[in-house]
C-alpha cells in the first residue's frame, strides 16, 4: 500500500546537494587556476598552440588535482575535465587518476605531488620501446602501460619524446621508453573500472569542448546581422542551433548519469555491476554526437570561427582528437552487453520513496497480467481502490499527495506495460489537475469522483484544421446567449471522440483579443449534446481519430472551466502534469527495445557487427532520453525548465521513428508481420514492430511538432523570433 514518506529522504538529499556544491566549488577553483579573459595559465582555447603544459602540471600538483584518484573522486575528475575541455587543454589528469590507484604507494605519492608525470597506454611499446601517438605526453616522465584483459601493467620511464604534427593541438607525441621500473597487477574488473573512469573523463572533455563551441555560436546568432536582422531570427539557424543544443544536453546528461552510477556502485556493492554499461552508453553517445556538435557550431559561426584567432578553430581540433581517442574501443560494446550478455539499460534511481513505490506498481501489474496480457478492468478497479488515479492530488482533495517522482514511476511503469489504463491516466493528468485548480465546486463534485475511479471517458478538443501546434490560432467560437453559450466550429484529429462521454473543449470567446491566446475559454461538454457530429477516421497506426463538428451547440455557463477568456491559463496549468506524462514515450521506447532484444537474443551470433553498432547508438540515445525526462520532471523554473522538456520530447519522438525502423530492418520481413502470425518472431499479444513503425510519426508531429519544439528551444537559448 502506498505511504507518504516525505521525510525519509531528507538527509540523503541534503548530502547529495552538499556534494554537488563541493564539486561546483572545485570546478570554479580549477577554472580560476586555468584563467579567463585572456589571462592565466590556459585561459581559453586560443592558448592551445602556445600553452605551457609543464607549468600547468606544476600548478595542478600544487592544487592537489593529481590526488583525486586517492579519493576515487570521479565526480571531481569529470568536473575538472570539463573545465579543461572548454579551453582545449589536454592535461593528462585522468591518467594520473588511474596511475595513483594502481602504482605502489611510494610511486603513487610521487604522482600526486607532481614529481612523476604519467600518461597511460593500453598499447604495448614496439620492439624498440617506441610508443605513440600519445595525448598530453609532451612533458611526461613515465608511461604506465596497462593490459585491460589481464590486469597487469608496467611503469616505464620516457627516454625521449617527439611531436607528431597533425589534427591534435597540442600535438600528439611519440615516445621511446626505457626498461620497466615497476610492475603492477590489478584485478581485471577493478582495472576496467579505472580505465572506464579515464574514458568518461575524456568524454566529458570532448562534450565540454563542443558545448563551448555551441555557446559561442549561440552568442553569435544574436549579434551577427544579415539581411537586416540577427541571423538567429532565421528559421534554419534556429533549427540547427536547437538540434545542437539537444546533442549537447543529451551527451552531458549521459556522462552525468554514468558518474552517478559509478559512484553509487563504488559506495554500495549491492547496487549491481552496471557502471561499465553506463560508461559505454555515455561514450557511445559522445562518439556519435561530439563532432556533429562542433560542425553545427562552425556552420553557425561561419567564417568568424574558421580562423585561429577564434576559440572555435582550436576547440574543433580538440573535439575531433578526443573523439578519435574514445572511438578506439568497440563500437558495438553496448549492444553486445544487451544482446550477448542479456543486460538491460541501467535503471534510473528516482529516490527511495519512488523506487519503493515502483515495486508496488510492479506487483499490481503482475497480479493482473496473465501470459503477458493485462486485464485492464481488473487493474483499473484495483488502482481505483488504492487511490492511484489521484496519486498526485492533494490529500485535502481526496488524493495521496505523492511526489512528482512517484507520479513519474506510475506513468512509466503503466506505459512499459503497454498502457492498459491509458485513458484513465490521461483524465487524471490532464483533466484532474486542471479541475482541481479551476473547476467550480459543482464540477469537482460531478467529475473528480469519476476521474478518481478511472471512469472518466473524455476526449481533447484542441486541434483544428488551421490550429495544430499553433493552438492560439483556433477558430471554433463560443458566443454568449444569456446563461448559455452557442458553439460553432470544427475540431480535427480528436482521439477517442467516438467513445467519449465528454469533450474538454478549447474555443474562442473573444475574436478581437490581443494577444490571440487571450480570448480562449475552456468548456467541459457532454458529447451527446445536440449539434455535435462525430466523423471517425482510421489513422496510419490503426487507431480511430475523429473530426468533430459543432453546429449551434448550446451549453450552459456551468460547463465553463475557469474564467471567460482565461482558457490559456487552464491549458498551460496542465503543463505541470505534462512533465510527468512525457516519460511515457521513453517508457514505450524501452518496452519496444526490450521486445527487439528478446528476439535478437535467440540467435545473438547472427546479428551483424554493423547492426550491433547501430543498436548501440539507439540504446545510448534512448538512455539519454530517459535521463532527460527525469531532469525535465525535476526542473521547476529557470532556463533549464524552459529547455529540457522540449529537448526530451524531440529526442524521444525522433528516436521512436529510428528505433521502429531499425527493428523492422534488423528482423527482416518477418519483423513486419503482426504478432501471432505463423512467420512472426513474436507471439500474439507481444509488441508489434509493425504497429510501432506506423505509430512512430505521431510522436514527432503530435502535441506540437518537433520543428515547433526546436523553435521553443531556440527561443529559450535567447534567439530572437523570426
Model segments located where?
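A short core secondary-structure module
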Residues: 115, 119-121, 128-166, 172, ...
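A short, Trp-centered hydrophobic/proline-enriched beta-strand micro-motif
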Residues: 113-126, 454-462
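C-terminal helix-coil-helix/basic helical segment that borders enzyme active sites and/or dimer interfaces
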Residues: 2-6, 10, 38-47, 226, ...
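Extended, hydrophobic interaction surfaces within ordered domains
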Residues: 214, 229-342
Amino acid at each position: 500500500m502506498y505511504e507518504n514518506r516525505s521525510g525519509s529522504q531528507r538527509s540523503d538529499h541534503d548530502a547529495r546537494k552538499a556534494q554537488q556544491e563541493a564539486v561546483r566549488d572545485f570546478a570554479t577553483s580549477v577554472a580560476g587556476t586555468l584563467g579567463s579573459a585572456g589571462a592565466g595559465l590556459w585561459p581559453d582555447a586560443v592558448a592551445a598552440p602556445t600553452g605551457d603544459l609543464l607549468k600547468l602540471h606544476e600548478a595542478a600538483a600544487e592544487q592537489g588535482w593529481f590526488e583525486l584518484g586517492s579519493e576515487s573522486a570521479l565526480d571531481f575528475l569529470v568536473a575538472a575535465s570539463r573545465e579543461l575541455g572548454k579551453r582545449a587543454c589536454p592535461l593528462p589528469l585522468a591518467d594520473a587518476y588511474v596511475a595513483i590507484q594502481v602504482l605502489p604507494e611510494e610511486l603513487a605519492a610521487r604522482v600526486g605531488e607532481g614529481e612523476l608525470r604519467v600518461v597511460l597506454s593500453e598499447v604495448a611499446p614496439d620492439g624498440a620501446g617506441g610508443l605513440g601517438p600519445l595525448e598530453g605526453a609532451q612533458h611526461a616522465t613515465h608511461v604506465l602501460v596497462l593490459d585491460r584483459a589481464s590486469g597487469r601493467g608496467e611503469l616505464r620511464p620516457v627516454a625521449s619524446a617527439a611531436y607528431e604534427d597533425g589534427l591534435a593541438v597540442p600535438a600528439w607525441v611519440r615516445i621511446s621508453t626505457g626498461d620497466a621500473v615497476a610492475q603492477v597487477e590489478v584485478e581485471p574488473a577493478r582495472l576496467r573500472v579505472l580505465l572506464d573512469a579515464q574514458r568518461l573523463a575524456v568524454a566529458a572533455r570532448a562534450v565540454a569542448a563542443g558545448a563551448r563551441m555551441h555557446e559561442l555560436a549561440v552568442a553569435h546568432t544574436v549579434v551577427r546581422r544579415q539581411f537586416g536582422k540577427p541571423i538567429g531570427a532565421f528559421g534554419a539557424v534556429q533549427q540547427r542551433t536547437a538540434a545542437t543544443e539537444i546533442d549537447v544536453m543529451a551527451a552531458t546528461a549521459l556522462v552525468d548519469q554514468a558518474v552517478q552510477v559509478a559512484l553509487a556502485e563504488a559506495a554500495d556493492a549491492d547496487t549491481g555491476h552496471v557502471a561499465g554499461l553506463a560508461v559505454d552508453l555515455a561514450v557511445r553517445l559522445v562518439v556519435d554526437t561530439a563532432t556533429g556538435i562542433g560542425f553545427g557550431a562552425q556552420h553557425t559561426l561561419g567564417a568568424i570561427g574558421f580562423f585561429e584567432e577564434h576559440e572555435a578553430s582550436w576547440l574543433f581540433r580538440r573535439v575531433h582528437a578526443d573523439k578519435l581517442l574514445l572511438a578506439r574501443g568497440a563500437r558495438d560494446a553496448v549492444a553486445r552487453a544487451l544482446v550477448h550478455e542479456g543486460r538491460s539499460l541501467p535503471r534510473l534511481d528516482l529516490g527511495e520513496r519512488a523506487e519503493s513505490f515502483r515495486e508496488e506498481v510492479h506487483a499490481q501489474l503482475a497480479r493482473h497480467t496473465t501470459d503477458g496480457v493485462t486485464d485492464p478492468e481488473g487493474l483499473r478497479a484495483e488502482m481505483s481502490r488504492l487511490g492511484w488515479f489521484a496519486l498526485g492530488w492533494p490529500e485535502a482533495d481526496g488524493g495521496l499527495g505523492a511526489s512528482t517522482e512517484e507520479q513519474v514511476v506510475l506513468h512509466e511503469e503503466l506505459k512499459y506495460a503497454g498502457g492498459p489504463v491509458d485513458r484513465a491516466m490521461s483524465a487524471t493528468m490532464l483533466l484532474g489537475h486542471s479541475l482541481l485548480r479551476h473547476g467550480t465546486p459543482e464540477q469537482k463534485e460531478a467529475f473528480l469522483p469519476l476521474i478518481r475511479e478511472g471512469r472518466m471517458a473524455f476526449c481533447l478538443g484542441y486541434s483544428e484544421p488551421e490550429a495544430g501546434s499553433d493552438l492560439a490560432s483556433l477558430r471554433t467560437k463560443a458566443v454568449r446567449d444569456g446563461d448559455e453559450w452557442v458553439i460553432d466550429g470544427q475540431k480535427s484529429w480528436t482521439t477517442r471522440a467516438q467513445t467519449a462521454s465528454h469533450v474538454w473543449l478549447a474555443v474562442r470567446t473573444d475574436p478581437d483579443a490581443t494577444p490571440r491566446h487571450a480570448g480562449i475559454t475552456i468548456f467541459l461538454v457532454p458529447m451527446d449534446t445536440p449539434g455535435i457530429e462525430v466523423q471517425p477516421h482510421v489513422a496510419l497506426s490503426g487507431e480511430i481519430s475523429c473530426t468533430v463538428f459543432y453546429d449551434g451547440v448550446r451549453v450552459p455557463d456551468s460547463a465553463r472551466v475557469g474564467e471567460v477568456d482565461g482558457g490559456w491559463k487552464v491549458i498551460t496549468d496542465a503543463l505541470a502534469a505534462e512533465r510527468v506524462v512525457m516519460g511515457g514515450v521513453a517508457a514505450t521506447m524501452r518496452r519496444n527495445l526490450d521486445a527487439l532484444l528478446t528476439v535478437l537474443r535467440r540467435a545473438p551470433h547472427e546479428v551483424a557487427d554493423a547492426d550491433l553498432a547501430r543498436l548501440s547508438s539507439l540504446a545510448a540515445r534512448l538512455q539519454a532520453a530517459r535521463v532527460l525526462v527525469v531532469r525535465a520532471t525535476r526542473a521547476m523554473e529557470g532556463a533549464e525548465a524552459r529547455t529540457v522538456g522540449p529537448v526530451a520530447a524531440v529526442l524521444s519522438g525522433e528516436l521512436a521513428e529510428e528505433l521502429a525502423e531499425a527493428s523492422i530492418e534488423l528482423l527482416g520481413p518477418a519483423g513486419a508481420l503482426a504478432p501471432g502470425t505463423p512467420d512472426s518472431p513474436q507471439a500474439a499479444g507481444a509488441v508489434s514492430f509493425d504497429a510501432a513503425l506506423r505509430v512512430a510519426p505521431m510522436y514527432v508531429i503530435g502535441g506540437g511538432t518537433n520543428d515547433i519544439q526546436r523553435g521553443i528551444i531556440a527561443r529559450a537559448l535567447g534567439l530572437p523570433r523570426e
